[in-house]
Amino acid sequence: MRNDVHLGHKARKRFGQNFLNDPYIIDGIVSAINPKPGQNLVEIGPGLGAITEPVGREVDKFTVIELDRDLAERLRNHPDLADKLTIHEGDAMRFDFTQLVKPNNKLRIFGNLPYNISTPLMFHLFEFHKDIQDMHFMLQKEVVNRLAAGPGSKAYGRLTVMAQYYCKVVPVLEVPPTAFVPPPKVDSAVVRLVPYEELPCPAKDLRLLDRVCREGFNQRRKTVRNCYKSLLSAEVLEELGVNPSMRPENLTLQQFVAMANWLADNPQH
């Protein structure tokens, strides 16, 4: 049997499909999610049901979002899952997650995310942070490293700052390529993202926070003074507790937010 065919389904390159088939890893992921009846569970990209099936054994109803028509059809006819699932066939990147929220029952989102869309999909999900209890995702290990990174490390970047702005980030489990069919060329890892009830350092204008992050990380080897000279003077940086001669890659989330909030308060400067 060809190694890109699993349970009779051929993995599609354009959907970035790699199917999980290691029972030990699957068990670890389901334990991390810890699904309970009555929770508002949503799986993104259930694929061939490696995580869907064991979650289905724990709960009576949950929702899945699947882009691949054949896989959605397969789930509709699944002997154990068909009655438990609400299937949304379509693109999670364009999906309005507010339609799934129930009173006093926030979303618990999980999935083995296609690596080609994981970053933009997370940015899309952050928009719904108030409606989400937690998220558990299998991602490229390098992406998990970026989510969990601290200032000054190579992995630290815009994704780090925006993820940690909205969520507590907890790496859960490392996953070797051999856990998949076909095996990807990279290591994977599972991460837990828990949106804050109250944002620890709220930005007055998210577009400005995004802008200071982009400008900083696009020129991460410059000094902060040079990087932001068109936006913030050295005096203002000093006032905000930012050393103008440090590099943007060493700025903390709090410092990025302080800079963005100063720009929000001083639009004409």
From Swiss-Prot:
Keyword Methyltransferase: yes
Catalysed transformations (reactions): adenosine(1518)/adenosine(1519) in 16S rRNA + 4 S-adenosyl-L-methionine = N(6)-dimethyladenosine(1518)/N(6)-dimethyladenosine(1519) in 16S rRNA + 4 S-adenosyl-L-homocysteine + 4 H(+)
Principal EC category: transferase
Binding site for S-adenosyl-L-methionine: 18, 20, 45, 66, 91, 112
Location relative to the cell: Cytoplasm
Keywords: Cytoplasm, Methyltransferase, RNA-binding, rRNA processing, S-adenosyl-L-methionine, Transferase
GO cellular component, one term: cytosol
PROSITE patterns: RRNA_A_DIMETH, SAM_RNA_A_N6_MT
Pfam families associated with the record: RrnaAD
Enzyme Commission numbers on file: 2.1.1.182
Keyword Nuclease: no
InterPro entries reported for this sequence: KsgA/Erm, rRNA_Ade_diMease-like_C, rRNA_Ade_Mease_Trfase_CS, rRNA_Ade_methylase_Trfase_N, rRNA_adenine_dimethylase, SAM-dependent_MTases_sf
Family: Belongs to the class I-like SAM-binding methyltransferase superfamily. rRNA adenine N(6)-methyltransferase family. RsmA subfamily.
Function: Specifically dimethylates two adjacent adenosines (A1518 and A1519) in the loop of a conserved hairpin near the 3'-end of 16S rRNA in the 30S particle. May play a critical role in biogenesis of 30S subunits.
The protein's name: Ribosomal RNA small subunit methyltransferase A
Classification lineage: Bacteria, Pseudomonadati, Pseudomonadota, Gammaproteobacteria, Vibrionales
Gene name tied to this protein: rsmA
